[in-house]
Curated annotation (Swiss-Prot):
It is linked to Microcephaly 21, primary, autosomal recessive: A form of microcephaly, a disease defined as a head circumference more than 3 standard deviations below the age, sex and ethnically matched mean. Brain weight is markedly reduced and the cerebral cortex is disproportionately small. MCPH21 features include mild intellectual disability, intrauterine growth retardation, short stature, and microcephaly. It is found in: Nucleus; Cytoplasm; Chromosome. Regulatory subunit of the condensin complex, a complex required for conversion of interphase chromatin into mitotic-like condense chromosomes. The condensin complex probably introduces positive supercoils into relaxed DNA in the presence of type I topoisomerases and converts nicked DNA into positive knotted forms in the presence of type II topoisomerases. May target the condensin complex to DNA via its C-terminal domain. May promote the resolution of double-strand DNA catenanes (intertwines) between sister chromatids. The gene is NCAPD2. The modification Phosphoserine is found at S20, S585, S1310, S1315, S1330, S1333, S1366, S1367, S1370, S1371, S1376, S1395. One of its GO terms (biological process) is cell division. Phosphorylated by CDK1. Its phosphorylation, as well as that of NCAPH and NCAPG subunits, activates the condensin complex and is required for chromosome condensation. InterPro entries: ARM-like, ARM-type_fold, CND1/NCAPD3, Cnd1_C, Condensin_cplx_su1, Condensin_cplx_su1_N. Residues 1-603 are annotated as: Interactions with SMC2 and SMC4. Residues 1369-1382 have a biased composition (Acidic residues). Residues 576-596, 1308-1336 have a biased composition (Polar residues). The keyword Cytoplasm applies. This is Condensin complex subunit 1. Keywords: Cell cycle, Cell division, Chromosome, Cytoplasm, Disease variant, DNA condensation, Mitosis, Nucleus, Phosphoprotein, Primary microcephaly.
C-alpha cells in the first residue's frame, strides 16, 4: 500500500499494530529477526538521507522489530537506534513549520506528514520508555549490590549513560508540540491518542522513585515544560488533573515534584485554573475513603502543604472546598488544610494595610487554627503549635491575638502528648523572642507604670467629659434646664400688685430690637431671670411692631406669651437675626452671643489636640496592659514548665532548658528559679541533657556584657554569686560540677580568677558575703584545677583562719571547703603505687584549725558547729596522723568545759544548792564535736588506712616478685593458679578489712580511748529528754549517737532500742529527721541488726512533720533501690507519699517508683500487698487518693503477662472483699490496666467472682470503661467477645447473676458466686488465707502491732508504756526514754547479698 494511502493509528499496546483493525489502517508486515536488524537499520538511515523524515513510512517495521527485541539486542544497536530517531524527529520538527505554512499542500502530502509524525513520535517515545524500564531495573539491582560502580553498570547495560539522554529527548518533544501541528489533522482537531502518547510518557517517567533526586532536576524541568505545553495548547487540563490525583494516591515521592510542576503551570504558563481543579478533586474525596487509604492521604496532604507554600494566593480562592476535611477522621488532611491556612496568613494576609474582607478571612483562618489547638489528635495539636510558632517568628500574628494564643500555648503545656508539650514550649519561646513589648518582662516592673498611666487616662477622660458638658450644650437642653426656675420667677412677678413691681429695665431710644434681644439673652445666660422678664415686658410695649415682641395672641395668657418670647430669643431667632444683621457696635449682645454660639468652632484646634492626646494615652495604656498580661502568662508558664524539667523524654527536657535560658535573658524574675532547678540535671545520665545544662550556663554566665575583660569578669562573678544566695548544699555541688567542667576546658578567663582572689583578700572593696562567695567560687574552680588553691594555700589560710576575734565562721567554713579540693579524693586513682596527698601535722593549716575550733568552743555562735564539722573533715582528709590533732581538739574543748563547770561551782555561795550546770550550748558543742570525730575516725580507718595498707601490700608483693629467683617462680604451680584467680589478693583484702573491723569493734570505744570518755555523757543526754530538753542539744546528741553507733556493731546493737525510741517518740521534727538519716546509714553498715526494726523506718513516711516525711522518703528510696531492706507490703507507705500535699515529697515518691519500675517485676510483685493495704478500712487511704495512687502505680504494668495475671488475681479478690469500698477499689484497679483480648478472656473466666457486685453503679461504670478501651483498638474478630462481655455486664447490672442465664451466650452451666459474708472481727483475715489463688493479697498485720513470738496466737493485749517527754520529771529512773523489753524486736533476719533478681523472686 502506498504510504499516502494508509493511516497510522496510535495503538494502546504494541500488539495492535500486528493486527488489521480497519480499512487503510497501517499494519506491521513482518517482525524482523535480530540478525537482520542492523542491516535494516542501515537501510533506514540511507533512506532518511535521501527522503528525509518521511522515510519512516517505509521503514517503520524495522523500528518496531527493534522495540520488539529490545531486551535481547546489542546495547550498541540500541544506542544507534535512539540517536538516529532523535535525528529523525529533530529534522521533522525543523521542516514542519514550512510545511504547515504551505497553502498548496495536498491532502495526500498532509496525510503522509501526519503518519510520519505519529510514527516518529511513537517510535521515539516507546524507545524512551524501554530505556527507562531497563534503567529502573538496574536501579533495583543497585540497591542490592550497593552504590559502588553504579555508573559503570548502567553504561554496561545501555552502552551509554541513559540519565543524560532523557532531557534532550523531552526538550525535542516540547519543541515539536510548540509547533502548530494540529493543522495536519482534519478540521485542525488533534486526536486525543497523540496527546496521551506524549503526556503518558511524562507520567511514566515521573513514576520513577529517583525522579526527585537532585541529579534528575533537568529531567523534571523538561517534563514540567512538556506537560505545560500540552496544557496550554492541547486542552490537557482535565486529563492532567485526573492523572495527578491518581499519582498522588499511589506514589508518595511525587508530592514535591507535582507541586513544583503545578506551581510553574499556574505562574509561568498562566494556568491558575488547574490549581482549582486539583483542589476540587481533593476536596470532593470522601473523608471516610481517605481514612482507609493512608498512603493516598499522605500524598494529598504533602501536596496541599507544599502547594500552599509556593502559591498561597492562588490556592486561597479554593480553600472553601477543603474545609470539610477539617471535620474528617484523617489527621494528616486536617494538618494539611491548617498548614495551608497558616501559609496564607504568612504570605498573603499579613500586614497592616489589609482590606476589611482580607482581615475577616485572616481572622477566620486564625480562629480555625486556635480551635484545632484542642483537636482530639495530638499530631494536629502539635502541628497547630508549630504553625503558630512560624506565624509568631515572622511577626504575622495580630497583637489582638497575642493573649489568646499565649493562653493556648500555656494550656497545652499540660497535654498528655510529649510532642505537644515540646511544641508548646517552643511557641512560648518564640513569643518571648518576638514579643513587641519589651526586652525585659517583669510583671512587677510593669504593674507600676500600668497603674500610673491608667489613672492618668481616667483623669483625662473625666476632664474631657467635663469640658464637653460645659462647652457645647444644646440651647434646647439649656432652655429646658432653666425653664422651671424661669416659670417660678415669672409667676412671682405676675402675682405682685401693680405698684410693687421692681424698677423696670430702661430701654434707650438709640437701642434697636436686636440690642434689646441681646441684653435679654445675656440676662438669661447669667440666670438673671427677673431682670430678663422685666426687660421683655418693657420691650413688648416699646417694640410692638418688631418680632418677636409683636407676636401677641389675645387668647394667650401673659405668662405663656412672655415664656414664648423668651424661648424664641434664647433658642435661636436672636442668633439667626444676628447673622443677617451683624453690628460691631452692639457690644454685649454681639460679643456674648458670638462667644456662646461659636465657642466650639473657636476651640477646634485645641479639641483636636486633646483628642490626639487622649488617643495616645489610650494606646499607651493598652500597650502596658497587653505587656502586663503577657508577662503574667509567661510567669504562669514558667511554673508549669519548671515541673517538666525532670520528664523522662530528653527532647522535652532540652526544650525546657532552652526556654529558661531565654526567659532569664528577658529578665523575668521567676526565671532564676528555673535556672537553679536545672542544676541537678548536670548529673543526668543522658549526655544530651548534661550538655544542654552546660550550654545553658555558658550562655547565661560565660558571656556577660562588658567593655573590658575585667568588667566582664565582674559581671560573671556577680551573676554566679546570686546563684549562691540561700543555695542548698545540693545546688552548690551542682554548680561546682559545672564550674569544674568550665575550668577543665579553660572556658573561664584568668581575669575571673584574678578578681576572685582580689575580692577574697579584700584588695577590692566588698561586703563579707561577697568575700565569702568569692572563696566558695575559688573552691569550686579548684575541683577542676587544684593548683588554683594549692599554689595559694597560705593565703587562703590567712583569709579565713586568721587570729582575729570574733571569727567569721562562715568564711572559715568556705575556706576549708576550698582547701579540701586540692586533694585527690574525688580524682580517678593514679594507681596504688602513689602515696596519697597529705600535709604534716605541724602545718600552719592544722595549727590554725585547732586553735580556731578550740577558741570558738566556748562562745555561743550557731555558725561554729557547721564550721567545726568541715574542719574535722579537712583534718582527717589532709593531715598525717589526724587522730592526734583531733584528740588534742577534743581534749582542749573538754578541758574548757570542765573549767566552766568548775567556775560555776566556785561561784556558788551555798554548797547545798543544786549542783552546778554546764551551759547548754557548751554541752551541745562538745557532743557534736565528739560525734564528728567519731564518724571521721571511722571513715579514715576504712578508706585512708585501709587504702594505705593495700598500697603497701601491693608494693611489697611487687618488690618480692622482682627479687625472686626465676626458678622459684615456677616451683609452685598451685600458688601461680591462685594468683591468676586473684585469690591471694582477695584473701589479703579480707585480712585488712578484718583488721580495720577489729579496731573499730575493740579499740575505738574502749575505755582507754578518747572517744570512749564521751559515751556516758552522750547516753545520759539521750536517755533523759526531760532533763535535757533543749531542742538544739537534743538534735546534736541524737546525731552524735547515730555517728557513734556507726563505729561498732556491739555498741550499735546495745543502743538501737534507744535510737528507734527517739525516732518514734521525740517531739522534735529535727531529731526525728536526723535519726532517720542515721538509722538509714546503720541499715547499710549493719543490715542484720537493723532489719528487725524496718517497720519503724517505714513508719516515718507517715510522720506529721513535712521535713521528716521528706527525709524518710529519701532514705527509704536509697535503701530500697540499693536492696538494703526487704521490700514488702509496707512499701505502700511510699505509695501514700504520691498524694502528699507537699509537691517535693510527691515528686520524690514518683521518682522512686519510676526507678523501681526498672528493676524487673518489682512493682508487679508488690502491687497485691499495696492494694490490700491501701484499701483496708483501718489502715488505708480515702477513695479519691486511692485512685490517684493506683493510677500512677498501674501505669508501670505494661507487659501482657503481668496484666493478665493481675486481672485474674483482682477478679478473685472480689470474693474475699469485706466492704463495698474494697470492691469499688478493685473495680477501679481493673479499669486502669492496659487490657488485651487475653486479659478480657481472663475476666470472663472469673466473671462469677464479681458478677454479683455489678449492681453497684460505680463498679458497673468501671467495667464498662474497660469495654470502651477494648473497643477502641479491637480487631474485627475480637469484637464478638467484647460484645459478649458487655451483654453479661448489663444483664448482671439490671437483673443480677440470674440475668446471665437468660442470655444464650457464655457457658451454659455457670455457677453463681456465693454471696460474700461479712467475716467476724476475730477471724478478720481468714477468708484471704483460705483462698489458695489469692495468697498475694493477704493483708499483713498492721504495722503498729509489735512482733509476736512464734507461739503467740493473738495480739498482745498489753498497751505499750508511753514515755512522756516532760521537763517536770523528778528522777533519772522516771526519765528513761528507752522502749521496754517486750517492745524490742527479738528475731533478727540476716540480709543476704543476693542479686536483685533473686531478691525479687
Amino acid at each position: 500500500m502506498a504510504p499516502q494511502m494508509y493511516e497510522f493509528h496510535l495503538p494502546l499496546s504494541p500488539e495492535e499494530l500486528l493486527k488489521s483493525g480497519g480499512v487503510n489502517q497501517y499494519v506491521v508486515q513482518e517482525v524482523l529477526s535480530i540478525k537482520h536488524l542492523p542491516p535494516q537499520l542501515r537501510a533506514f538511515q540511507a533512506a532518511f538521507r535521501a527522503q528525509g523524515p518521511l522515510a519512516m513510512l517505509q521503514h517503520f517495521d524495522t523500528i518496531y522489530s527493534i522495540l520488539h527485541h529490545f531486551r535481547s539486542i546489542d546495547p550498541g544497536l540500541k544506542e544507534d537506534t535512539l540517536q538516529f530517531l532523535i535525528k529523525v524527529v529533530s529534522r521533522h520538527s525543523q521542516e514542519l513549520p514550512a510545511i504547515l505554512d504551505d497553502t498548496t499542500l495536498s491532502g495526500s502530502d498532509r496525510n503522509a506528514h501526519l503518519n510520519a509524525l505519529k510514527m516518529n513520535c511513537y517510535a521515539l517515545i516507546r524507545l524512551l520508555e524501554s530505556f527507562e524500564t531497563m534503567a529502573s531495573q538496574t536501579n533495583l539491582v543497585d540497591l542490592d549490590l550497593g552504590g559502588k560502580g553504579k555508573k559503570a553498570r548502567t553504561k554496561a547495560a545501555h552502552g551509554f549513560d541513559w540519565e543524560e539522554e532523557r532531557q534532550p529527548i523531552l526538550q525535542l518533544l516540547t519543541q515539536l508540540l510548540q509547533l502548530d501541528i494540529r493543522h495536519l489533522w482534519n478540521h485542525s482537531i488533534i486526536e486525543e491518542e497523540f496527546v496521551s502518547l506524549v503526556t503518558g510518557c511524562c507520567y511514566r517517567l515521573l513514576e520513577n522513585p529517583t525522579i526527585n533526586h537532585q541529579k534528575n532536576r533537568p529531567t523534571r524541568e523538561a517534563i514540567t515544560h512538556l506537560l505545560g505545553v500540552a496544557l496550554t495548547r492541547y486542552n490537557h487540563m482535565l486529563s492532567a488533573t485526573v492523572k495527578i490525583i491518581q499519582m498522588l494516591q499511589h506514589f508518595e515521592h511525587l508530592a514535591p515534584v507535582l507541586v513544583a510542576a503545578v506551581s510553574l503551570w499556574a505562574t509561568d504558563y498562566g494556568m491558575k485554573s488547574i490549581v482549582g481543579e486539583i483542589v476540587r478533586e481533593i476536596g470532593q474525596k470522601c473523608p471516610q475513603e481517605l481514612s482507609r487509604d493512608p498512603s493516598g492521604t499522605k500524598g494529598f496532604a504533602a501536596f496541599l502543604t507544599e502547594l500552599a507554600e509556593r502559591v498561597p494566593a492562588i490556592l486561597m480562592s479554593s480553600m472553601c472546598i477543603l474545609l470539610d476535611h477539617l471535620d474528617g477522621e484523617n489527621y494528616m488532611m486536617r494538618n494539611a488544610v491548617l498548614a495551608a491556612m497558616a501559609e496564607m496568613v504568612l504570605q498573603v494576609l499579613s500586614g497592616d494595610q489589609l482590606e476589611a474582607a482580607a482581615r475577616d478571612t485572616r481572622d477566620q483562618f486564625l480562629d480555625t487554627l486556635q480551635a484545632h489547638g484542642h483537636d482530639v489528635n495530638s499530631f494536629v495539636r502539635s502541628r497547630v503549635l508549630q504553625l503558630f510558632t512560624r506565624i509568631v517568628q515572622q511577626k504575622a500574628l495580630p497583637l489582638t491575638r497575642f493573649q489568646a494564643v499565649v493562653a493556648l500555648a500555656v494550656g497545652r503545656l499540660a497535654d498528655k502528648s510529649v510532642l505537644v508539650c515540646k511544641n508548646a514550649i517552643q511557641l512560648l519561646a518564640s513569643f518571648l523572642a518576638n514579643n513587641p513589648f519589651s526586652c525585659k518582662l517583669s510583671d512587677a516592673d510593669l504593674a507600676g507604670p500600668l497603674q500610673k498611666e491608667t489613672q492618668k487616662l481616667q483623669e483625662m477622660r473625666a476632664q474631657r467629659r467635663t469640658a464637653a458638658a460645659s462647652a457645647v450644650l444644646d440651647p434646647e437642653e439649656e432652655w429646658e434646664a432653666m425653664l422651671p426656675e424661669l416659670k417660678s420667677t415669672l409667676q412671682q412677678l405676675l402675682q405682685l400688685p401693680q405698684g410693687e413691681e421692681e424698677i423696670p429695665e430702661q430701654i434707650a431710644n438709640t437701642e434697636t430690637t436686636e440690642d434689646v434681644k441681646g441684653r435679654i439673652y445675656q440676662l438669661l445666660a447669667k440666670a438673671s431671670y427677673k431682670k430678663a422678664i422685666i426687660l421683655t415686658r418693657e420691650a413688648t410695649g416699646h417694640f410692638q411692631e418688631s418680632e418677636p415682641f409683636s407676636h401677641i395672641d389675645p387668647e394667650e395668657s401673659e405668662e405663656t406669651r412672655l415664656l414664648n418670647i423668651l424661648g424664641l430669643i434664647f433658642k435661636g431667632p436672636a442668633a439667626s437675626t444676628q447673622e443677617k444683621n451683624p453690628r460691631e457696635s452692639t457690644g454685649n449682645m454681639v460679643t456674648g452671643q458670638t462667644v456662646c454660639k461659636n465657642k466650639p468652632n473657636m476651640s477646634d484646634p485645641e479639641e483636636s489636640r486633646g483628642n490626639d492626646e487622649l488617643v495616645k494615652q489610650e494606646m499607651l495604656v493598652q500597650y502596658l496592659q497587653d505587656a502586663y498580661s503577657f508577662s503574667r502568662k509567661i510567669t504562669e508558664a514558667i511554673g508549669i514548665i519548671s515541673k517538666m524539667m525532670y520528664e523522662n523524654t530528653t527532647t522535652v527536657v532540652q526544650e525546657v532548658i532552652e526556654f529558661f535560658v531565654m526567659v532569664f535573658q528577658f529578665g523575668v524574675p521567676q526565671a532564676l528559679f528555673g535556672v537553679r532547678r536545672m542544676l541537678p540535671l548536670i548529673w543526668s545520665k543522658e549526655p544530651g541533657v548534661r550538655e544542654a545544662v552546660l550550654n545553658a550556663y555558658r550562655q547565661l554566665y560565660l558571656n556577660p556584657k562588658g567593655d573590658s575583660a575585667r568588667a566582664k569578669a565582674q559581671a560573671l562573678i556577680q551573676n554566679l554569686s546570686l546563684l549562691l544566695v540561700d543555695a542548698s548544699v545540693g545546688t552548690i555541688q551542682c554548680l561546682e560540677e559545672i564550674l569544674c567542667e568550665f575550668v577543665q576546658k579553660d572556658e573561664l578567663k584568668p581575669a575571673v580568677t584574678q578578681l576572685l582572689w582580689e575580692r577574697a583578700t579584700e584588695k577590692v572593696a566588698c561586703c563579707p558575703l561577697e568575700r565569702c562567695s568569692s572563696v566558695m567560687l575559688l573552691g569550686m574552680m579548684a575541683r577542676g584545677k587544684p593548683e588554683i588553691v594549692g599554689s595559694n594555700l597560705d593565703t587562703l589560710v590567712s583569709i579565713g583562719l586568721d587570729e582575729k576575734f570574733p571569727q567569721d565562721y562562715r568564711l572559715a567554713q568556705q575556706v576549708c571547703h576550698a582547701i579540701a579540693n586540692i586533694s585527690d579524693r574525688r580524682k580517678p586513682s593514679l594507681g596504688k603505687r602513689h602515696p596519697p596527698f597529705r600535709l604534716p601535722q605541724e602545718h600552719r593549716l592544722f595549727e590554725r584549725l585547732r586553735e580556731t575550733v578550740t577558741k570558738g568552743f566556748v562562745h555561743p555562735d550557731p555558725l561554729w558547729i557547721p564550721f567545726k564539722e568541715v574542719a574535722v573533715t579537712l583534718i582527717y582528709q589532709l593531715a598525717e596522723g589526724p587522730e592526734v590533732i583531733c584528740a588534742q581538739i577534743l581534749q582542749g574543748c573538754a578541758k574548757q568545759a570542765l573549767e566552766k563547770l568548775e567556775e560555776k561551782r566556785t561561784s556558788q555561795e551555798d554548797p547545798k544548792e543544786s549542783p552546778a550546770m554546764l551551759p547548754t550550748f557548751l554541752l551541745m558543742n562538745l557532743l557534736s564535736l565528739a560525734g564528728d570525730v567519731a564518724l571521721q575516725q571511722l571513715v579514715h580507718l576504712e578508706q585512708a588506712v585501709s587504702g594505705e595498707l593495700c598500697r603497701r601490700r601491693v608494693l611489697r608483693e611487687e618488690q618480692e616478685h622482682k627479687t625472686k629467683d626465676p626458678k622459684e617462680k615456677n616451683t609452685s604451680s598451685e600458688t601461680t593458679m591462685e594468683e591468676e584467680l586473684g585469690l591471694v589478693g582477695a584473701t589479703a583484702d579480707d585480712t585488712e578489712a578484718e583488721l580495720i573491723r577489729g579496731i573499730c569493734e575493740m579499740e575505738l570505744l574502749d575505755g582507754k580511748q578518747t572517744l570512749a570518755a564521751f559515751v556516758p555523757l552522750l547516753l545520759k543526754v539521750c536517755n533523759n529528754p526531760g532533763l535535757y530538753s533543749n531542742p538544739d542539744l537534743s538534735a546534736a546528741a541524737s546525731l552524735a549517737l547515730g555517728k557513734f553507733c556507726m563505729i561498732s556493731a556491739t555498741f550499735c546493737d546495745s543502743q538501737l532500742r534507744l535510737l528507734f525510741t527517739m525516732l518514734e517518740k521525740s517531739p522534735l521534727p529535727i531529731v526525728r529527721s536526723n535519726l532517720m538519716v542515721a538509722t538509714g546509714d546503720l541499715a547499710i553498715r549493719f543490715p542484720n541488726l537493723v532489719d528487725p526494726w524496718t517497720p519503724h523506718l517505714y513508719a516515718r513516711l507517715r510522720d506529721p512533720a513535712q521535713q521528716v516525711r521528706k527525709t524518710a522518703g529519701l532514705v527509704m528510696t536509697h535503701l530500697i533501690l540499693k536492696d538494703m531492706v526487704k521490700v514488702k507490703g509496707q512499701v505502700s507507705e511510699m505509695a501514700v507519699l504520691l498524694i502528699d500535699p507537699e509537691p517535693q515529697i510527691a515528686a520524690l515518691a514518683k521518682n522512686f517508683f519510676n526507678e523501681l519500675s526498672h528493676k524487673g517485676n518489682a512493682i508487679y510483685n508488690l502491687l497485691p500487698d499495696i492494694i490490700s493495704r491501701l484499701s483496708d478500712p483501718e489502715l488505708g487511704v480515702e477513695e479519691e487518693p486511692f485512685h490517684t495512687i493506683m493510677k500512677q502505680l498501674l501505669s508501670y504494668i505494661t507487659k501482657d503477662k503481668q496484666t493478665e495475671s493481675l486481672v485474674e488475681k483482682l477478679c478473685q479478690r472480689f470474693r474475699t472483699s469485706r466492704t463495698e469500698r474494697q470492691q469499688r477499689d478493685l473495680a477501679y484497679c481493673v479499669s486502669q490496666l492496659p487490657l488485651t483480648e487475653r486479659g478480657l478472656r481472663k475476666m470472663l473466666d472469673n466473671f462469677d467472682c464479681f458478677g454479683d457486685k455489678l449492681s453497684d453503679e460505680s463498679i458497673f461504670s468501671a467495667f464498662l470503661s474497660v469495654v470502651g478501651k477494648l473497643r477502641r483498638g479491637a480487631k474485627p474478630e475480637g469484637k464478638a467477645i467484647i460484645d459478649e462481655f458487655e451483654q453479661k455486664l448489663r444483664a448482671c447490672h439490671t437483673r443480677g447473676l440470674d440475668g446471665i442465664k437468660e442470655l444464650e451466650i457464655g457457658q451454659a452451666g455457670s455457677q453463681r458466686a456465693p454471696s460474700a459474708k461479712k467475716p467476724s472481727t476475730g477471724s478478720r483475715y481468714q477468708p484471704l488465707a483460705s483462698t489458695a489463688s489469692d495468697n498475694d493479697f493477704v493483708t499483713p498485720e498492721p504495722r503498729r502491732t509489735t512482733r509476736r513470738h512464734p507461739n503467740t496466737q493473738q495480739r498482745a493485749s498489753k498497751k505499750k508504756p508511753k514515755v512522756v517527754f516532760s521537763s517536770d520529771e523528778s528522777s533519772e529512773e522516771d526519765l528513761s526514754a528507752e522502749m521496754t523489753e517486750d517492745e524490742t524486736p527479738k528475731k533478727t533476719t540476716p540480709i543476704l547479698r543476693a542479686s536483685a533478681r533473686r531478691h525479687r523472686s
